[in-house]
Amino acid sequence: MTSQAAAPWLTPEAIATAEQIASGYAQAFDRPLIAPSNAPLAQELFAAAIVVLAHDGRALNQGEGPRLIYANRSALRLWGRPWAEMVGMPSKNTAEPAEQTSRQQALATAQHQNAISGYSGIRIDRQGRRFQINRAQLWTLWNASGEACGQAACFSDWWWL
């Protein structure tokens, strides 16, 4: 079995975040994010083919804004970053500067409506390569007290530019 040091997505904090991501998605879209399985949710979400990311609840206009709190294996591969580098970085760094205004507008809309579907935008990987995401879904994350504590996004439709 993989140790938590080798599998940071299996730490108690990451497991709780995976549960918030999955429950927030189900609440927002009235269906599960990933198919139910006998494996632990945190492992299944990390291994999912769909790209899944989440950031904390810092204000979009506060300093560097929200920081990533989760990225599954598909996200890590797409952005070309390891967990330790991706998780904790400002989420705005997933997009190039020219795209950050439209990204921030979509996040604000999703925050106001609790969820949106059909978002498209251009992102940038670690090496500066640009890629288009299409039909992304964005939703609010909720803590145990029912307060908004971040946002998540998923998509499977993307291509290099």
Task: Give residue spans per PLM region.
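Residue-level detector of alpha-helix boundaries and kinks
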Residues: 10, 37, 112-113
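Sensory/regulatory domains in signal-transduction proteins
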Residues: 46-161
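Acidic, metal-coordinating catalytic segment for phosphate/diphosphate chemistry
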Residues: 34-42
